[in-house]
Amino acid sequence: MNASRASFSAWQTYLKERSPLPVIATIGLLQSLSSNYLFRQELDGAGILMSTACLTFLFILMRLMDEIKDHQKDRIAHPERPLPRGLIAPAQMRSAIQVLIGGLLAVGALLFLLRSPESGAALVFTVGYSLLMYKEFFCPAFINKNAFFYAFSHQLILIPMYVFSVAMVSPEAAFTARTLWFSLTGLGASFAFEVCRKLDPDAHPILRTYLALHGRTACVLVIVLALGLLSVSAWQIGVQNLIWPAVGLLILFLPLVYFRPERFKLIEAASAFVGLVQLLSVTVDHFL
């Protein structure tokens, strides 16, 4: 019993530090709400709640997978994290990954049969893609040749995730052009944040950040390209009036990469704001 309590406490600590439930559940909820209002005027409460729950567990699953993949690097660069410091053993984490995969696949099958084939298929596909990411697409040497290519291959999972959240409330519209553009707003915002959060000029070399591997100009160029994708996609679904000012704000901070690189946290914060606006945009536009 004491061992069970200790294990439960360890997982509580892990979630608090690496996958804070209030944060990731809020992200899932905001995505689900915007997915609802992308095609609907009324609120599908049950669909939104189920979508939020599934997205939350997907976020937890992908974080666990990253913890395992980054274990050796974290032992050197981030020994304070749960896995390197021994709070949870790698075997326990792998077991949790297996349980989550099995549970999400079972939910996907039930959704396919009881909710809509589109939602179930999208969830199963997303879980399958996360497995490919976990295994680095069975060609780790190839996808690790370029850090940006590696990141992009992993960011692509957002497309089926957005298709899933739309399919939960509007299954007939899950595979339409509007849904694709909506998912591309998520991809653009997320990819920009992914690069912006790894601009620390003093990061440990073993972390192989985008800045260390490719330099400042390449990082800025990729961020601008991601923001371009976000901006065009936002225009396609009619939320550019909300998205473009946030994009402009982030662009104003980008010169810090050259002139005040130690202020990289400001760029990260601005990119997080862009991500928040993207998540809220369709919902806010609905009520304007």
What do these predicted regions represent?
Residues R63-G102, L187-S231:
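Solvent-exposed interhelical
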Residues M1-I68, S95, F138-K145, H154-I157, ...:
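Topogenic membrane-insertion module of multi-pass membrane proteins
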Residues I27-L33, P84-L87, F148-A167, L211-L221, ...:
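Small-residue-rich segments of transmembrane alpha-helices in multi-pass membrane proteins
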Residues S34-T52, L105-A121, P160-L184, V232-N241, ...:
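Helix-coil boundary and interhelical linker segments in multi-pass alpha-helical membrane proteins
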Residues T56-E67, V127-C139, I159-F164, F182-A203, ...:
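Transmembrane alpha-helical segments that form the membrane-embedded catalytic/substrate-channel core
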Residues G28-Y37, I101-L110, V124-L131, L158-V163, ...:
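Hydrophobic core of alpha-helical transmembrane segments in multi-pass integral membrane proteins
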Residues S4-Q12, P140-I143, A218, L242-L288:
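Extended hydrophobic alpha-helices typical of membrane-associated regions
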Residues S7-Q12, K16, Q92-S170:
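Intramembrane alpha-helical segments
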